[in-house]
Design a protein with these regions (language model features):
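Conserved class I S-adenosyl-L-methionine
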Residues: 1-28, 135
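Conserved beta-strand signature within the Rossmann-like core of class I S-adenosyl-L-methionine
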Residues: 124-132
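Short, glycine-/aromatic-enriched active-site segment of Class I SAM-dependent methyltransferases
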Residues: 131-150
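Short alpha-helix
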Residues: 151-166
Length: 193
């Protein structure tokens, strides 16, 4: 996306849903917290989180070297890690993991969710994800073919079931930022017991 100079457009298009996800996740927090952006792209969410007074640590992880390099160019003080999400294990577990438009790139999203639950999230930690690529969103059905990248097409129910099966608690889901042309970003969240 960076090579094609499309990361800025992704940031602009995803900002409303990400802000909705963050508002939901941060509103109950009253103490300092730690954060990971899983699939951080150019690092815009990490930069935003580093400006939040209660955020003690914000880390961005991405498997694309161009994205990590751009994130580091834009934010020389931020923590950005080049790694496949399935291989990454933070030195210290965190309170909040956010992922926007990433999980469907994995052939087994439940495996990624379980890896994050086991290795990234501390007790009472929250995972919140947003996906625009799901069965009920008819406008996305040609994305995999158009982009030339495999994507895992799941229904809203399938996504929620992955969270339930993982053993996460307090699972919630909703469609964020719908409009006349778009059914909305599917947001799913849950916490570690």
């Amino acid at each position: 996306w960076v090579i094609k100079n499309k990361d800025g457009g992704m940031q602009k298009n995803h900002t409303p849903a990400v802000m909705d996800m963050l508002q939901y996740s941060l509103s109950p927090l009253h103490t300092g917290f730690s954060f990971i952006d899983a699939g951080c792209g150019n690092g815009w969410v990490v930069r935003y989180m580093n400006n939040q007074s209660m955020c003690e640590t914000a880390i961005g992880v991405d498997g694309a070297i161009e994205m990590i390099n751009k994130a580091k160019r834009l934010d020389t003080e931020g923590q950005y890690i080049l790694s496949d999400l399935m291989d990454y294990k933070p030195m210290k577990k965190v309170d909040l993991v956010l992922s926007m438009e990433v999980f469907y790139y994995f052939s087994n999203p439940s495996k990624l969710l379980n890896h994050i639950k086991k290795h990234w999230l501390q007790s009472k930690g929250r995972l919140i994800i947003g996906v625009d690529y799901y069965k009920e969103n008819q406008g996305c059905h040609n994305w995999s073919e158009n982009v030339g990248t495999p994507m895992e097409m799941l229904s809203r129910k399938d996504w929620v079931d992955i969270f339930i099966t993982s053993g996460l608690s307090n699972i919630k889901h909703w469609l964020s930022c719908p409009n006349n042309d778009f059914i909305g970003t599917l947001v799913i969240t849950g916490t570690v017991s």
